């Protein structure tokens, strides 16, 4: 039997390519870790907060979550990473706080506190899902662990069902069966769930929050806020920075800021959605805390810190540490009890128009914050086939 003398060269070339690929992955990993260290000054996260090992050369698997395509090259952002600043995430947080009724002008202290609390919460979710994935014999977070997390709250799972409804996938029957099983358990095993699911009263949970937050907007925001027809600010998130389309560049930066959790690629869009819900809940919880304590006005930074002092996870009730009042070392100033009154709008027709604008905004608040379709679903109306 003769051996092809060129076979040794082919094998050597294969080993050379493998070494180059490994070297490329190591260089990329070191760059990601360097950026994570830079982000830590703003996110207040450390490596000790992460349960997953930071190992070089473990790529994320390309698997579908919703029918959207995370690896759509036509939407690739060409921005170089070294031109990105983590302060951009603070700007996005500020936009979300304004639309949630926290205040018309940006407050850097409140923005930083809410952003750090949100990032800590999302990392806690990733730790929970990663530990669950390891118990299931997996090396990364999959959509199964994601649904087990969201299933802890029936209303949030319904929101997830509405916004991330997966398309039928004949190649992933296990996921379809798991998804259907969770829906079945949710529908039949929770008392009153059939009525909640099929009745318009299911919106009351979010409508109550929206109504209270709109009261702040109506009392303290200028009339020009209601006349602005640009609704992109309502859809602005960490991975949709312009409020119009999904950005792979920002999704990668958001993933790096979280400490690069090992997850299926498109789960980053759901984590971004959970981050938006977390910001809304923090604003609402602090507003209600101010109502109970008798403070009449927009919450200040000390109110946010005191309101969130004994609160763990604001959505799924997971344990979150390192946010105690002693660690923050607050300098609390005395509360200023000042009852607010409606804005003085001169002119009958201006008053009528303002009331109408506020009513229309309140009716739209639930839609843009809780039930509006995720913008990326319209962007990713593409073929979901993969090149494995």
Curated annotation (Swiss-Prot):
Superkingdom assignment: Eukaryota
GO biological process: cell differentiation; male sex determination; male somatic sex determination; masculinization of hermaphroditic germ-line; positive regulation of gene expression; positive regulation of MAP kinase activity; positive regulation of meiotic cell cycle process involved in oocyte maturation; positive regulation of oocyte development
Protein name: Sex-determination protein fem-3
InterPro entries registered for this protein in UniProt: BBS5/fem-3 (IPR030804)
Function text: Required for male development. In XO (male) animals, fem-3 directs male differentiation in all tissues. In XX (hermaphrodite) animals, it specifies the first 80 or so germ cells to be sperm. Negatively regulates male development when bound to tra-2. Together with fem-2 associates with the CBC(fem-1) E3 ubiquitin-protein ligase complex which mediates the ubiquitination and subsequent proteasomal degradation of tra-1.
Keywords: Developmental protein, Differentiation, Repeat, Sexual differentiation, Spermatogenesis, Ubl conjugation pathway
UniProt gene name: fem-3
Quaternary organization: Component of a complex containing fem-1, fem-2 and fem-3. Interacts with fem-1 and fem-2 (via N-terminus). Part of a E3 ubiquitin-protein ligase complex, at least composed of cul-2, elc-1, tra-1, fem-1, fem-2 and fem-3; mediates the ubiquitination and subsequent proteasomal degradation of tra-1. Interacts with tra-1. Interacts with sel-10. Interacts with tra-2.
Molecular function per GO: protein phosphatase binding
Keyword field contains Membrane: no
Effect of residue 299 to S: In allele Q77
Sequence-type repeats, residues: 7-10, 110-113, 141-144, 234-237, 284-287, 371-374
Cellular compartments per GO CC: Cul2-RING ubiquitin ligase complex; cytoplasm; protein serine/threonine phosphatase complex; protein-containing complex
């Amino acid at each position: 039997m003769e051996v092809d003398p060129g076979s040794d060269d082919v094998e050597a070339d294969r080993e050379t390519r493998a070494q180059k690929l490994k070297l490329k992955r190591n260089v990329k990993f070191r760059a990601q870790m360097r950026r994570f260290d830079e982000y830590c000054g703003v996110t207040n996260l450390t490596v000790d907060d992460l349960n997953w090992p930071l190992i070089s050369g473990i790529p994320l698997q390309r698997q579908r979550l919703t029918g959207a395509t995370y690896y759509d090259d036509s939407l690739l952002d060409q921005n170089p990473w070294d031109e990105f600043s983590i302060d951009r995430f603070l700007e996005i947080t500020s936009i979300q706080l304004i639309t949630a009724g926290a205040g018309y002008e940006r407050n850097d202290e409140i923005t930083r506190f809410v952003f750090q609390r949100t990032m800590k919460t999302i990392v806690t979710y990733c730790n929970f899902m990663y530990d669950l994935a390891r118990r299931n014999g997996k090396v990364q977070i999959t959509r199964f662990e994601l649904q087990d997390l969201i299933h802890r709250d029936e209303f949030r799972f319904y929101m997830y069902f509405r916004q991330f409804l997966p398309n039928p996938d004949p190649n992933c029957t296990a996921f379809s069966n798991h998804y259907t099983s969770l829906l079945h358990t949710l529908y039949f095993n929770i008392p009153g769930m059939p009525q909640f699911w099929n009745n318009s009263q299911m919106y009351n949970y979010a409508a109550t929050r929206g109504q209270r937050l709109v009261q702040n907007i109506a009392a303290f925001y200028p009339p020009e806020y209601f006349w602005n027809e640009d609704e992109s600010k309502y859809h602005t998130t960490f991975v949709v920075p312009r409020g119009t389309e999904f950005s792979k560049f920002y999704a990668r930066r958001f993933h790096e800021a979280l400490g690069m959790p090992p997850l299926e690629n498109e789960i980053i869009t759901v984590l971004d959605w959970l981050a938006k819900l977390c910001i809304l809940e923090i604003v609402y919880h602090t507003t209600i805390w101010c109502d109970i304590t008798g403070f009449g006005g927009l919450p200040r930074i000390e109110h946010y810190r005191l309101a969130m002092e004994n609160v763990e996870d604001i959505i799924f009730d997971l344990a979150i540490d390192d946010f105690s009042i002693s660690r923050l070392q607050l300098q609390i100033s005395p509360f200023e009890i000042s009852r607010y009154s409606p804005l003085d709008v001169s002119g009958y027709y201006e008053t009528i128009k303002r009331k109408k604008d506020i009513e229309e905004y309140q009716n739209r608040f639930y839609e843009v914050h809780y039930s509006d379709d995720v913008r990326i679903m319209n962007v990713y109306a593409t073929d979901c086939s993969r090149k494995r």
